[in-house]
């Protein structure tokens, strides 16, 4: 299985864990022009972001897209961040947190060479004691 297929498989497993953990419905639907992974209570839109902690080539990071972030922020949507370790064909979740899109710190967006060149940012699970995605935000 190539790296891209493994990433898709692990991402799907992370989505399933997030849906069970937060009692969300996975629907991969379009919401105000962007794709979201799940709906929480009251139809609130969430996107699941997964990062592999045991990557060989680089450190783990979550990739956020500006167009999606803007929609989630305006609609009081959120993210579920899942930090996992790949174990065989499965995953072991190390940390999982849901967070309102509005509660993320100010983001400096860049243009990446992925997904049509849209503005994006890659955020490590821990960017310092005071700005950790996995510890210090207002969780839902």
Residue ranges and their predicted role:
Residues 1-140:
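Nucleic-acid endonuclease domains
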């Amino acid at each position: 299985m190539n790296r891209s297929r493994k990433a898709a498989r692990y991402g799907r497993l992370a989505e399933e864990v997030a849906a069970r953990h937060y009692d969300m419905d996975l629907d991969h639907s379009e919401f105000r022009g962007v794709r979201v992974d799940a709906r929480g209570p009251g139809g609130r839109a969430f996107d699941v972001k997964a990062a592999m902690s045991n990557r060989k080539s680089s450190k783990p990071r979550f990739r956020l897209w500006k167009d999606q972030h803007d929609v989630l922020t305006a609609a009081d949507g959120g993210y579920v961040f899942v930090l996992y370790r790949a174990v065989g064909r499965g995953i072991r979740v190390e940390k999982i947190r849901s967070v309102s899109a509005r509660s993320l710190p100010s983001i400096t967006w860049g243009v990446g060479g992925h997904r049509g060149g849209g503005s994006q940012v890659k955020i490590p699970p821990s960017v310092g004691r005071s700005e950790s995605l996995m510890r210090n935000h207002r969780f839902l």
